[in-house]
Amino acid sequence: MRRNQYGQPIGEALPHWQPAGMPGHTPLQGRFCRLEPLNLERWGDALYQAYQTAEDDRDWTYLFWERPQSRADFQRYLQAQASSADRNTMVVIDRANGRAVGTCAFLRIDPANGVAELGTINWSPLMKRSALGSEAIFLMLRHLFDDLGYRRCEWKCDSLNLPSRQAAERLGFRYEGT
């Protein structure tokens, strides 16, 4: 371990570091699912139908938005995600049937430092407790680290959202504090 002039551990120098690329602009192909950048015209109706299969609003509790109550509200929700400067939202497509079944996003993207966050993860009932969710996150991580050369990926969730915290830990993320 490298140390500074005071004997403090400071980690290894990165003299050849180059800024990473921007994630979320290319489709990502897996065995069970495919991720595509959010396209409102192509996926809006299918996503609305997928989220309508939920019995209630509980899946929206920890998101920044309440569950849209109409197709028009849902369109505004998608437009807000698509127009945000600090996120690239991806649509999860089930390869078995070609249906859009959820969304996830690259957030707080910082190519200069090689850091990005995964968040606004919203799986419809059509993909919960299936290989689709794990593979979607794997595809995002592989894209960040292997394709683009990122050094760090963060998973931020509400501290009360136990299912999200458990999923993050299962996928290898470590709690760093609140």
Show which residues each predicted segment covers.
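GNAT-family acyltransferases
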Residues: M1-S130, H143
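Glycine-rich acyl-CoA binding loop
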Residues: G133-S134
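Conserved GNAT acetyl-CoA-binding A-motif
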Residues: D146-K156
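Conserved beta-strand-loop-alpha-helix junction that forms the acyl-donor binding cleft
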Residues: W155-R165
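Conserved catalytic-core motifs of GNAT/GCN5-like acyltransferases
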Residues: R174-T178
